[in-house]
């Protein structure tokens, strides 16, 4: 795992030399990991398909059935944030709620920890995910790695959450401390990576997801920006390969933008176990589908895949 700012500065070099099979033998992923080569047709004899893992948070089983639907609170004041938490808790089509403190003014870790305890009570039986998204990854506020680590530490120690999102390309020592504390507190840790300008190669997508697993991520998350349907299909294919060849961990992958809409509703086909949806016409990322619509589409696809009595 390395710093995102270093990745951006050397993007041309990374794109030229690290995307295909040699990336799996790089210093980031040791050859001892014994990763299987990507075979788009079938597994070779002796290969075992990863055992799919299910994570249960409250009454929500992630990794089982149709992808679970998450909605984000994009509120800009504590009062409107709490109002949204209560409203989302009463929406049966939503399976989980994402708290987004990066949009709520200039709250400190202590201030949000206090606020999160009240918000958590309002969420009822819905799992609560906490995400502080930096502006460099599409969020509302830019903070240093040290500040980020202190914020998460405060919320994990004194706030109320079930599950946290950790930006993959933060300082690795900060990320590891957050993961260590989250697991000690019995919380679900989810590394994430967001590419708001482009879609990496299929093998680079796979590599980044496996980097997350290696660092202890319970759920693997990656979002890319699709500029055409081919970008979306590449993300979907990479997700399928991770699920069928490399990892049984639950995943949350998506291609953003209008060309990536299909990826948000077809996770049961590809291996993505969660999806973000829009409430009230305000998306937290480009290309989100209204929550009732995406739930309906996924249910239709599920029933067609597994017809009753078949």
Positions of PLM-derived features:
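C-terminal segment of N-terminal export signals and the immediately downstream linker at the start
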Residues: 1, 22-59
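N-terminal export signals
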Residues: 6-29
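N-terminal glycine-rich anion-binding loop in soluble enzyme alpha/beta folds
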Residues: 43-48, 67-79
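N-terminal small/glycine-rich loop or linker at the start of catalytic domains
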Residues: 57-73, 130-139, 182-195
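Short, well-ordered coil/turn segments that N-cap beta-strands
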Residues: 65-67, 93-95, 124-126, 160-162, ...
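Active-site beta->alpha loop and helix N-cap motifs at the rims of alpha/beta catalytic domains
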Residues: 72-89, 96-99, 103-177
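A generic secondary-structure signal
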Residues: 87-91, 118, 154, 181, ...
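Catalytic alpha/beta core domains of metabolic enzymes, predominantly
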Residues: 168-178, 184-309
């Amino acid at each position: 795992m390395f710093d995102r700012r270093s990745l951006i500065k050397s993007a041309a070099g990374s794109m030229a030399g690290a995307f295909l099979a040699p990336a799996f033998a790089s210093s980031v992923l040791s050859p001892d990991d014994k990763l299987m080569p990507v075979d788009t047709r079938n597994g070779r004899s002796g290969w075992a398909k990863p055992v799919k893992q299910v994570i249960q948070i409250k009454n929500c089983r992630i990794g089982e059935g149709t992808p679970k639907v998450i909605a984000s609170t994009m509120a800009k004041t504590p009062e409107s944030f709490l109002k949204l938490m209560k409203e989302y808790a009463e929406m049966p089509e939503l399976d989980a709620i994402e708290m987004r403190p990066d949009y709520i003014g200039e709250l400190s870790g202590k201030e949000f920890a206090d606020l999160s305890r009240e918000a958590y009570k309002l969420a009822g039986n819905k799992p609560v995910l906490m995400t502080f998204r930096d502006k460099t990854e599409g969020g509302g506020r830019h903070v240093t790695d040290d500040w980020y680590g202190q914020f998460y530490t405060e919320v994990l120690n004194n706030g109320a959450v079930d599950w946290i999102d950790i930006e993959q390309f933060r300082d690795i020592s900060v990320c590891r401390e957050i993961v260590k504390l989250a697991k000690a507190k019995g919380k679900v840790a989810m590394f994430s990576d967001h590419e708001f300008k482009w879609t990496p190669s299929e093998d680079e997508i796979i590599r980044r997801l496996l980097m997350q697993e290696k660092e202890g991520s319970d759920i693997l998350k990656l979002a890319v920006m699709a500029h055409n349907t081919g970008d979306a299909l590449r993300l979907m294919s990479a997700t399928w390969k991770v699920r069928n060849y490399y990892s049984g961990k639950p995943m949350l992958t998506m291609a953003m933008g209008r060309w990536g809409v299909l990826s948000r509703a077809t996770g049961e086909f590809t291996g993505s176990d969660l999806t973000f949806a829009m409430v009230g016409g305000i998306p937290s990322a480009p290309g989100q589908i209204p929550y009732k619509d995406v739930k309906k589409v996924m249910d239709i696809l599920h029933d067609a895949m597994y017809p009753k009595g078949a």
